[in-house]
């Protein structure tokens, strides 16, 4: 009923004479609302995308070698921790409470479009920010979101407290350094964090988080969502973390990182994902911000501010050296053993896994013995061409106008020109108080007079001139901002609400601009588009962000004049408004010392919540200690490789005879690459068993599935393409469980993944063509490689299901493998 009634109102407004228009009607005219969806041309998409990805490319899951599924401590080649992955570490209630508050913080912003392929993502900041490099006049303060949501803001604190406690438990030294550096008045609830970045449905391209504290870490928490994929990837290291709601990743934000693709059955399928990054914005501890805190504090004491300041003095702390540059990277060659050494549930055998990792690097031929093929094949499955993949952004995308102005697309400009008379005095006088109307009339006349003077001066130099040149340092420019201040209070008064909606803001300011443009023509005698809607739109955006001249750069007397005038305008609006007085969400003008006024104590025990300290103990978190050294070459390590038993009647000749003809583009790609041809023409890998091998203390035994193993007690078991020979899923699952019990530590399940590595990025016609031939082609390759007549090939999701998702430590992808081979690390029991 409400929607229907709204439509009727709009219809009435379009036909009613101006004098009968109700107060809110002017700002809800349908033609003036911004376009919800705008179709960009192919050229616009291509230009925006190419410019963005030149500096910030997207990387897909296939571009990374390891996907971590379980708790992980990932280190670089020097042993320095790059990331700690903690699945499910955030309590559900804390995640939900924070999500309910922070969800609206993520708004369309062009400021991060370079990390989203040239398009405005849903992103925002909360807490405190320095606004260095921004046209906002007043620096080093609460974000607008925090200021406007001060009453609900404390619901974020449980999440902050848990995340801080987890950070402290895992990285006590870095936590202490960050805690010592962050100014007390810009802490979020006593934590070492000053700022939150909130992202919604935002697949980030590769970037570093410039401005974060160099001596600390950032913490990424997934608050809510329904999605697959979108792993957080450390691009220079070739690893990514499969995150889901309530997961936490503590990582070095100065490494290049990004999100992999969303894993959707169809590109237009819905998905949702709300994340929050907690960090210390280092500029908030620099002298310029400290001076701003001191200025505000002195002013608060001088006027006897109420409530009183939360602190008596500002302390300049040691903020360390923050270079705002990418951190140096020291990647290493990835192997299944090296990856498994990072998995927390295998920390008791880390030294042994690192020894096996070293052994593989020393003896690359062992890769074939252990896994059936090399970890990297240069002439195997070729990389997909760009033309075979869907765009990162679909052809129809949301194109939003930046905050503070209006959309210049569609019929909005024409509709605004037709209705500009709404700003005439006879239509406003009955709805606004006399004081505010007087300010509007005087400010409008003053600005038009200055515009006319500037125009006449320009025309004396060039009588043929048709366009007005806007001088940003002129009295006319200052008068325009004064006029905007009056208009802003008029909007609030007309709507009887402190926070107009985006549509109401848009409608008001486009009408405002149309009225001024019309007045320049009719009252100043200027050409119709001498000033123009576009130029007024640009200046309105300047006004929204504080003007082109920062308040702090103005002479003291001018600063005082502007602040006092803003105050008088607001008071005039309040005197003329019948609405009850509410909290003023006038963030841009807030120059009070309101730091920490929003802080509240969290009553954990009273609410039946575990305290952060108790929760950390419950999780069993321990500090990341020094890097574990590889086991000595003489330490006993036993690796058992299990091969599928060859079928009695199967021969290489039989396998070759069953190879399908490579007639389609996809079958040629799968079967005719040099590595695939070697498999088809070569000897099967399981025709004969090699003798046991020894490398110091490392012993490698190879046997067939089903052989007697009574006297064998391996540390690690590698199942080499065994599950492909088992038709029934339950039987395959039972076999994994059996070998997991045999292995002392973990099992490496090595199998063909019949799904294309870029499955979720393939154009539909390419995906269909691939799926038509993939299973037959891989069956032929598998039969040739393992001398089997029957095989059932599976996808990664089905293999993970067979191995029990909660027992998966990681997935390793063999790069360029002709069999599209992967290895899953399966931990049979949770080991302390």
From Swiss-Prot:
Keyword DNA-binding among UniProt keywords: yes
MF (Gene Ontology): DNA binding; metal ion binding; thymine dioxygenase activity
Chain segments carrying region Disordered: 1-24
Chief localization: nucleus
Coiled-coil ranges from the UniProt annotation: none
List of residues binding 2-oxoglutarate: 273
Region (Thymine dioxygenase): 80-282
Localization per record: Nucleus
Ranges of compositional bias, category Basic and acidic residues: 1-12
Keywords assigned: Dioxygenase, DNA-binding, Iron, Metal-binding, Nucleus, Oxidoreductase
Cofactor note: Binds 1 Fe(2+) ion per subunit.
Residues binding Fe cation, per UniProt: 207, 209, 257
Any Gene Ontology CC annotation: nucleus
Involved in J base recognition, conferring specificity towards J-DNA (site feature) positions: 542
Named cofactor requirement(s): Fe(2+)
InterPro entries in the record: 2OGFeDO_JBP1/TET_oxygenase_dom, DB_JBP1, DB_JBP1_sf
Record EC number: 1.14.11.6
Oligomeric form and interacting partners: Monomer. Binds to DNA as a monomer.
Role according to the record: Dioxygenase that catalyzes the first step of DNA base J (beta-d-glucosyl-HOMedU) biosynthesis by converting thymine to 5-hydroxymethyluracil (HOMedU). DNA base J is a hypermodified thymidine residue found in the genome of kinetoplastid parasites, which is localized primarily to repetitive DNA, namely the telomeres, and is implicated in the regulation of antigenic variation. Also specifically binds to base J-containing DNA (J-DNA).
Protein name: Thymine dioxygenase JBP1-A
Gene of this entry: JBP1A
